[in-house]
């Protein structure tokens, strides 16, 4: 299985730090299961994760699930296994607390899904707005995005941590940020890309709406008033934001 771990890591385009992280987590997985994958061994491994914090468990589960899928795809495993996080964040918690989603900025097999998630999380955009984003809407000199909607224009500052993922997409051919043969993708495509990315990160409970809510919570924490936040979101009235300011 050690060779399988090395082959799996080599098959992914990872930074040096990510390679080390994957190797450490999968070597730990190998030691616990003894190189044999079955339901009992996986249950034992999952039980061993109880001592780690939620974010660390999610990272380890994500690495192991990707590895298990790799083994299944190659025919090494005859049965498909997938581990689930047992301690889920409840919907109520998600709506009231800012989540640690730093793993969204790490390597992924779903770069389009990651960019969609980060555009929602960092700028509060809706999937419909993302689908219509033109590369000309971005000014990379001043790091701003201009959006016109319903005769309302808003200027959004692009966060530094978003830029590396965004610039990569802006350098590709085409007028739209996301397009296929010159046409925007369907709503289902955006949904599927985001879902695949969230599943990879073991954040299956999240949706585009809840990611946008994370943007709202962060902006409120940063001192934005209800009126200022409504302008950032392109809302005609701040009424729908009242529940976050009670």
Curated annotation (Swiss-Prot):
GO-annotated biological processes: DNA transposition
GO cellular component, one term: cytoplasm
Tyr recombinase domain boundaries: 84-246
CDD domains the record matches: INT_StrepXerD_C_like
Source species, domain of life: Bacteria
Domain Core-binding (CB): 1-72
An example Gene Ontology molecular-function term: DNA binding
Catalytic site: 149, 212, 244
SUPFAM superfamilies per the UniProt record, alphabetical: DNA breaking-rejoining enzymes
PROSITE patterns in the cross-refs: CB, TYR_RECOMBINASE
Keywords: Cytoplasm, DNA integration, DNA recombination, DNA-binding
Disulfide bonds: none
Database matches in InterPro entries: CB (IPR044068), DNA_brk_join_enz (IPR011010), Integrase-like_cat_sf (IPR013762), Integrase_catalytic (IPR002104), Integrase_recombinase_N (IPR010998), Tyrosine_recombinase_XerD-like (IPR020876)
Localisation per UniProt entry: Cytoplasm
NCBIfam families (alphabetical): PRK02436.1
Its job: Putative tyrosine recombinase. Not involved in the cutting and rejoining of the recombining DNA molecules on dif(SL) site.
Family: Belongs to the 'phage' integrase family. XerD-like subfamily.
Cited HAMAP family: Recomb_XerD_like
Name the UniProt record assigns to this protein: Tyrosine recombinase XerD-like
């Amino acid at each position: 299985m050690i060779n399988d771990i090395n082959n799996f890591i080599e098959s992914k385009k990872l930074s040096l730090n990510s390679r080390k992280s994957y190797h450490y987590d999968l070597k730990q997985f190998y030691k616990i299961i003894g190189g044999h994958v079955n339901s009992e061994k996986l249950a034992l491994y999952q039980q061993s994760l109880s001592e780690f914090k939620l974010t660390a468990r999610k990272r380890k589960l994500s690495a192991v699930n990707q590895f298990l899928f790799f083994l299944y795809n190659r025919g090494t495993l005859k049965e498909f296994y997938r581990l689930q996080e047992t301690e889920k964040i409840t919907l109520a918690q998600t709506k009231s607390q800012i989540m640690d989603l730093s793993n969204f900025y790490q390597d992924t097999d779903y770069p389009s899904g990651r960019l969609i998630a980060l555009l929602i999380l960092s700028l509060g955009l809706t999937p419909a707005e993302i689908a219509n984003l033109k590369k000309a809407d971005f000014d990379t000199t001043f790091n701003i995005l201009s959006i016109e909607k319903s005769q309302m224009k808003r200027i959004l500052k692009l966060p530094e941590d978003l830029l590396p993922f965004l610039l990569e997409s802006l350098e590709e051919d085409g007028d739209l940020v996301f397009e296929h043969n010159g046409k925007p993708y369907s709503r289902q495509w955006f949904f599927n890309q985001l879902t695949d990315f969230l599943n990879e990160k073991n954040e299956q409970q999240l949706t585009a709406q809840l990611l946008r809510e994370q943007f709202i919570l962060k902006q409120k924490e940063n001192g934005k008033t209800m009126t200022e936040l409504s302008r950032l979101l392109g809302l005609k009235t701040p009424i729908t934001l009242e529940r976050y300011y009670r």
